[in-house]
């Protein structure tokens, strides 16, 4: 019995120490319609991405969500990336245009032609990284199309 209590106590201590994945919320935070759209989309996000369950984020934010370890991270309400130019090569996943940017250890995908803007960082542990976008597309597709849209698939 003492061993069971010790294990339960250790589990509670460990649970109390785990604060979640550090994910900085978008700055400035979305307001008004954008904040509402992010909150609505977050409520539609899947429980699993690439078969990995949601993971707590810190600080807690209605504009962030994470899955797995290493974490696949979504942030809603970010700014338009500086890397987006009229000649940027985009990928389209389930009708949503994304700007892919290779990182040191994975990819950052940012929506193009949706408002508010969403970014998803996918570590290279999940190759091909763009597969995560398939799982997220249903929720992201609920975000309004930007007008005018800079995205090639909206014309």
Short names for language-model regions:
Residues 1-9:
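N-terminal export and membrane-targeting signals
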Residues 4, 25, 54, 63, ...:
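Short, well-ordered helical secondary-structure segments
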Residues 13-16:
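C-terminal motif of bacterial Sec signal peptides marking the signal peptidase cleavage site
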Residues 18-73, 78-80, 155:
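Extracytoplasmic low-complexity, Pro/Thr/Ser/Ala/Gly-rich segments
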Residues 81, 85-155:
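Extracytosolic low-complexity repeat regions of secreted or lipid-anchored proteins
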